[in-house]
C-alpha cells in the first residue's frame, strides 16, 4: 500500500501549517492562504511529464543501484522531482543510450526477456509507466496518468476517473472523432469493437487476478 506522501511528498510542513492556520482568526487565515504557497505537491498541477513520474516512481520497471542504501533509507526521489535524475527506468528502446544497462546485460544477456516482450512492451504487471513513456500520446501530447485515473474519486478497481471506461477517455483529446466514431473504428457505435482501448490498449499482461492493458497506446500492427 501507499500513504499520502507517496504522491504528495513530505507532509510535515503542510500539517504544521494547517495546525497554525486553524488557530488564526478568519481574516488572518485568509491572508495567510493568499500569500503563502502550498508546501504540498498536487500531481494534477504538475506538467504531464513530472505528474506521470509521480506514478512511475512505483509503477515503472526501474533498476536499483546497489551502491545506494535504499533498503535502509528508501529512494531519494520525492514527488515533483525529475525521476530520471535519480531512478533508472529500463527501456529496451533506449538500451544503447542507457550506459548503466550495459554491464547488467553483459552479466545476464536475457534479463530484458524477464521483464519485456520481444517487441519491447512491458510484460510485468503494475509497470504501466514503461508503456506510457513509449506512447505518442505522452511523447507528443500531454497525456499523463491523471488524464484517465483518479486516486480519490474513483472505484478502487483500476482507479479510473468518472467516464473513463468509455471512449471519452480518448475523445477528451481526439475531439474530431466524436461526431462519427464508427467511421474510425469501422464498428457499430457503443459496441466492443468500437471501444478505442480494445484496439489501441490491448491486454498484454496478467496480474492481480486479471488481464492488464498495454499503456503504449499505439496503432495495432499484426506483425
Tell me what each language-model feature is.
Residues 1-223:
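Primarily the internal scaffold of c-type cytochrome electron-transfer domains
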